[in-house]
Amino acid sequence: MNCPDCGDEQTRVIDTETSADGTSVRRRRECQRCSFRFTTYERPEWDSLQVKKRNGTIEPFNRTKLRAGIERAVEKRDVSETTVTTLVDDIESALQDRETRLVSSSLIGELVSDRLRDLDKVAYIRFVSVYKAFSEPQEFLRELDAVLNAEIDDFEAPNDSQ
C-alpha cells in the first residue's frame, strides 16, 4: 500500500478492526519513510455474473436487459412496475445465490418463464414464444395448450379442506 502523502511503498499496519456486521476491515497504517498515518478499508468485491449465450459468447449479466424482456412480455397487461421490479430482483437474487458466476442464458430464460407462468399466462406465452424461438404455429399452439390444460387441471382439482 503506497503512502498517500509521500508515495512510498513501505507502510505498516498499526491497528486492524473488523466492522460490527463483519463486511469490512478497517486498518490504520503508518508510512515507514515520513510517519504519515492513514486509514484503509477492505470490503469483498463480488465477482460479477457472466452470461453464456446460445452462440457461446460470454457477456456480463445485464439487469436492464432482463427487465426489458420482462416488460415486453407484460406490456399492456395488469402488472405493476413494483411487481416487475420484484420479479427482476428475485431472478437476480436466484442467480447470485448460485455457486458459479457463469450462468447460461437458457437458465435465465427458464427462471423468467417459470415466474411469468405463475404471474400472468398471457405474458408467459409472449415470453416463451420469443425465448423458445417458435418457428411454426404448431409450437405456439402446443405451448398454449399446455398452459390451458394446466389451468383446467388447477380449476378441477378437488378441494381437500372440506
UniProtKB/Swiss-Prot annotation:
Keywords: ATP-binding, DNA-binding, Metal-binding, Nucleotide-binding, Repressor, Transcription, Transcription regulation, Zinc, Zinc-finger. It comes from the Archaea. Residues 49-139 form the ATP-cone domain. Belongs to the NrdR family. This is Transcriptional repressor NrdR. InterPro entries: ATP-cone_dom, NrdR-like_N, RNR_NrdR-like. Binds 1 zinc ion. It comes from Halorubrum lacusprofundi (strain ATCC 49239 / DSM 5036 / JCM 8891 / ACAM 34). Its cofactor is Zn(2+). Negatively regulates transcription of bacterial ribonucleotide reductase nrd genes and operons by binding to NrdR-boxes. GO terms for biological process: negative regulation of DNA-templated transcription. Residues 1-21 are annotated as: Disordered.
